[in-house]
Amino acid sequence: MAFVPPQAGYDRAITVFSPDGRLFQVNYAREAVKRGATAVGVKCGEGVVLAVEKRITSRLIEPDSYEKIFQIDDHIAAASSGIIADARVLVNRARLEAQIYRLTYGEPAPVSVIVKKICDLKQMHTQYGGVRPFGAALLMAGINDRPELYETDPSGAYFAWKAVAIGSGRNTAMAIFEEKYRDDMNLEDAIKLALMALAKTMENPSADNIEVAVITVKDKKFRKLTRDEIEKYLSEVLKEVEEEEVKEKEEDYSELDSNY
């Protein structure tokens, strides 16, 4: 008789809790996000920034066709990590909900309303048979009265953040945000902080494998940065990172000298 692990029944069933209160399929969906490319978001008084790593696996792929930041409405955007096909379904649903709200009420949808709609859909996929959880997390950003930034989890939970990261580089990026985030940052500072957090999680950061979008308080319009703009900000950030690393090495050497 083949050995069956004790958790196997809970492992296969999406709607059954394990004895210790877990839904294994939801945990596995979170693992898919942890393996995904890093995406970061930073909020400031002038607007909100989204930046993502584009993992282009072949030089034959057209970089512009590999989209990781999506426009939901004029004033709302989303960045994804995890299974990109799952993220696309969620993005299309968010776009639909935003248009339904606009047609029904004659005004742009609040960011929080669209986030809740998407997370309601995610939660449904943890509760019913015949479906599986979405293996994707979204960072959703937008502006109604003020800048807003949310993280959505495969379980259907969502949280508002000042700065946040998802994907394989989450821990590294969050450590940088904890150290360097300031409430009085302007939009340029927020872009540089997002790029710094992203660059620290990547082997060879460049304008070709990074995508950045902003929504400003001034016009409440979604806009992707051009390659030249990304290159300009990234060169400044990489120079700053290099200077910090040199300074850290000098401090380490001086500490060693003082011990002799």
Curated annotation (Swiss-Prot):
InterPro entries: Ntn_hydrolases_N, Proteasome_alpha, Proteasome_alpha-type, Proteasome_asu_arc, Proteasome_asu_N, Proteasome_sua/b
Location in the cell: Cytoplasm
Record-level GO BP terms: proteasomal protein catabolic process; ubiquitin-dependent protein catabolic process
Description of how activity is regulated: The formation of the proteasomal ATPase PAN-20S proteasome complex, via the docking of the C-termini of PAN into the intersubunit pockets in the alpha-rings, triggers opening of the gate for substrate entry. Interconversion between the open-gate and close-gate conformations leads to a dynamic regulation of the 20S proteasome proteolysis activity.
UniProt keywords, alphabetically: Cytoplasm, Proteasome
Name of a matching Pfam family: Proteasome_A_N
Highest taxon of source: Archaea
GO annotation, cellular component aspect: cytoplasm; proteasome core complex, alpha-subunit complex
Keyword hit for Membrane: no
Keyword Lipid metabolism applies: no
Record GO terms (molecular function): threonine-type endopeptidase activity
Principal localisation: cytoplasm
Task of the protein: Component of the proteasome core, a large protease complex with broad specificity involved in protein degradation.
Subunit structure: The 20S proteasome core is composed of 14 alpha and 14 beta subunits that assemble into four stacked heptameric rings, resulting in a barrel-shaped structure. The two inner rings, each composed of seven catalytic beta subunits, are sandwiched by two outer rings, each composed of seven alpha subunits. The catalytic chamber with the active sites is on the inside of the barrel. Has a gated structure, the ends of the cylinder being occluded by the N-termini of the alpha-subunits. Is capped at one or both ends by the proteasome regulatory ATPase, PAN.
Family to which the UniProt record says this protein belongs: Belongs to the peptidase T1A family.
HAMAP family, alphabetized: Proteasome_A_A
Record's protein name: Proteasome subunit alpha
Species per Swiss-Prot/TrEMBL record: Pyrococcus furiosus (strain ATCC 43587 / DSM 3638 / JCM 8422 / Vc1)
Gene label: psmA
